[in-house]
């Protein structure tokens, strides 16, 4: 029987494929611990888009400066290991509902879309470095990689 379902936020995915990131060891540890506890780690098409955006954006604009081919290679790493939560009409409708009911504006629309996918696919936890971004959504538990890694120490 599988353990807890987690959506892995883009900020975690980006650190997972970049060994020179200062948070890389923490992310690797948190993911390994989650998998040892039979957690099912998930992602969405939105995560891939955010990941791709950062990977292919120039270094001088706070990106990784990778080619699309290298971004594809790195995305394939997590796509092989994680479960895709597919987009659907239900996800779109839940997202639209969240935008209005939670008075969402600006870049917050992206996190609302992740929450919509989580709700439709019954995922209650998101592994993220930005817990506050998900605080407005009841029933969603934002888990920092540090707290997940500390759970089993």
At which residue positions do the language-model features occur?
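Acidic, PIN/NYN-like endoribonuclease modules and their adjacent C-terminal/linker elements
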Residues: 1-5, 112-153
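Short, well-structured N-terminal submotif of metal-dependent ribonuclease cores
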Residues: 1-43, 58-69, 149-153
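Alpha-helix/helix-capping structural signal
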Residues: 11-12, 46, 113, 132
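Short acidic, glycine/proline-enriched helix-loop-strand junctions
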Residues: 74-92, 96, 103, 134-153
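Active-site neighborhoods of divalent-metal-dependent phosphate/nucleic-acid chemistry enzymes
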Residues: 83-129
């Amino acid at each position: 029987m599988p353990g807890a379902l987690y959506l892995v936020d883009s900020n975690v995915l980006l650190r997972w494929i970049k060994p020179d990131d200062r948070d890389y060891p923490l992310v690797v540890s948190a993911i390994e611990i989650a998998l040892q506890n039979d957690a099912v780690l998930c992602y969405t098409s939105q995560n891939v888009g955010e990941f791709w955006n950062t990977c292919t954006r120039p270094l001088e604009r706070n990106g990784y400066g990778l080619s699309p081919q290298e971004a594809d290679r790195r995305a394939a790493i997590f796509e092989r290991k994680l479960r895709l939560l597919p987009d659907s009409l239900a996800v779109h409708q839940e997202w639209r509902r969240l935008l209005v009911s939670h008075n969402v504006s600006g870049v917050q629309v992206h996190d609302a879309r992740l929450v919509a996918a989580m709700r439709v696919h019954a995922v209650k936890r998101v592994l993220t470095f930005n817990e506050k971004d998900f605080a407005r959504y009841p029933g969603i538990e934002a888990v920092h990689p540090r707290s997940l890694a500390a759970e089993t120490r």
